[in-house]
Structures are given as structure tokens and as C-alpha cells.
């Protein structure tokens, strides 16, 4: 564990670093797609982790999506995720985490979504993360543009050394 990591984050220290890998997306209103992803979790010694994510199309490398925000631990076992998307969406997700040996599992869902006037309608988001050693897998569910909450994204990433 980094010596200057805030003690509230000790259980999530294995998240720190840069992760890369491949994922796939689907939704009733779009064609299925594959993507390459890079996620970085970092810290500045305060009780939050900084989070930055970007994806590009697996087929041609064109940029697809990005998110930036903060992961907070308000109390042991609880999580708060604050994110901003360049598509005009902000979200607050609340959830929990559990650590079993070297395995970390996190589950969160939105309690608040903000939309700019030009953003597409998003009504719900939920995320599940699993960190097992140097592998991070996740799934995202989304409710948007008149569709109910359902599977949208899934990826497997590996820690970069």
C-alpha cells in the first residue's frame, strides 16, 4: 500500500494504477460494438481515488467515450462514485464493496443523474466491478432513451506494470 494513501482507502489500494483491456457494448438502440479501454485510479493522499477512463473503437482506434471523477469511501464497506461524461451527463452512484482475500467486489447504482440540455436521456446506471489480482472486470447497466435498465457494457482489463 502506498505510504501516503489515506487510511479510509486502504481496502481499495489494489485499484491504484492503470488498467487496459477490451470490452463490448450493446443496447437496443445501437449496433453492438467492441472497444479498447484504459482506466486509471490515482490518489493525492485525501479520502478519495481519482478515476479517469477512455475508450476507442477496437476496429479503427477512433475515440468513443471518456469519464472522469472520484471514488469515495464514506465509511468502511460503502462507496460513492461521482462522474462526469463529455456527452453532457453527470452521475452520482452509491453502493458497497467487499474484500475477500485478494478479491474486491464493488456494486453501485445511480442516486442522481444530471443532464445538459443537449444530452441524451439517461435515467439509470449501475456498475459492478471485480478486482482479482491484476485483472479488473466490470459490467455497466443503463436505462436510457425510453429503454429500461439493462446490460450495456462489459470488459476485462489488466494492470499495466
From Swiss-Prot:
State if Membrane is listed as a keyword. Answer: no
Domain comment (free text): Forms a 10-stranded antiparallel beta-barrel structure able to accommodate a hydrophobic ligand in its interior. In fact, this fold hosts the heme group, which is located in a wide surface cleft.
Q: Where does heme b bind?
A: 152
The entry's protein name is Peroxynitrite isomerase 1
Q: Which cofactor does it need?
A: heme b
- Report the catalytic activity: peroxynitrite = nitrate
Gene Ontology MF terms in the entry: heme binding; metal ion binding; peroxynitrite isomerase activity
Gene3D superfamilies per record: 2.40.128.20
Give the pathway annotation.
Answer: Nitrogen metabolism
State how the cofactor is bound. Binds 1 heme b group per subunit, that coordinates a highly solvent-exposed Fe(III) atom.
Q: What class of enzyme is it?
A: isomerase
Amino acid at each position: 500500500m502506498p505510504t501516503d494513501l489515506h487510511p479510509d482507502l486502504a481496502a481499495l489500494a489494489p485499484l491504484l494504477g492503470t488498467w487496459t483491456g477490451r470490452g463490448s457494448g450493446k443496447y437496443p438502440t445501437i449496433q453492438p460494438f467492441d472497444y479498447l479501454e484504459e482506466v486509471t485510479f490515482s490518489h493525492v493522499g485525501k479520502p478519495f481515488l481519482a478515476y479517469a477512463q477512455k475508450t476507442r473503437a477496437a476496429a479503427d482506434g477512433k475515440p468513443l467515450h471518456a469519464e472522469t471523477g472520484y471514488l469515495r469511501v464514506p465509511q468502511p464497506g460503502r462507496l460513492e462514485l461521482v462522474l462526469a461524461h463529455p456527452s453532457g451527463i453527470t452521475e452520482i452512484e452509491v453502493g458497497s464493496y467487499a474484500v475477500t482475500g485478494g478479491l474486491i467486489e464493488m456494486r453501485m447504482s445511480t442516486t442522481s443523474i444530471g443532464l445538459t440540455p443537449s444530452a441524451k436521456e439517461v435515467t439509470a446506471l449501475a456498475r459492478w466491478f471485480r478486482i482479482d489480482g491484476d485483472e479488473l472486470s466490470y459490467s455497466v447497466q443503463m436505462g436510457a432513451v425510453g429503454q429500461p435498465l439493462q446490460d450495456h457494457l462489459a470488459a476485462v482489463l489488466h494492470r499495466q506494470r
